[in-house]
């Protein structure tokens, strides 16, 4: 590739073919980075005659010469990421050697998913037809600096403190505003 750095951007809220373009260019790249979004997005690739659907992993993951980076702007749902790695590993091979994830990525929690669902069902909010996967609420936490990030999982004390503080906020919202049952701490700590 002649360019030292190349960005592939979509300006139409998805479905422009960014993943296919990145896949095509990854043969000649050292690395490709997914810089934002969550597992609501998706791109379909054909690799060695097999259909692959990616949601969190950059499409460069199928190219053994390119590192695949997940940047700090991505909100990560651990279950979805692990399932995707498990599904793609037999096809792409050596994923963990090529995959790098920013420790500053926000982790999507069960309370994000619940809030997303409650907002979509509520008449008090203008619904936008989300995928109900907690992407928007996770970004709300990121912007308000209360998000649980990957790096927080390295310290059980810090992780539990952050989860307790954030869960108290969400439980107040669930109970007082939506009239719903509070989430138990164990319901959110399982993702780590």
Predicted regions and their residues:
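N-terminal phosphate-binding or glycine-rich loops at protein starts, especially the Walker A/P-loop
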Residues: 4-37
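Glycine-rich nucleotide/cofactor/substrate-binding loop typically near the N-terminus or early
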Residues: 36-188
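Conserved small/polar residues in nucleotide/adenosyl-binding loops
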Residues: 191-192
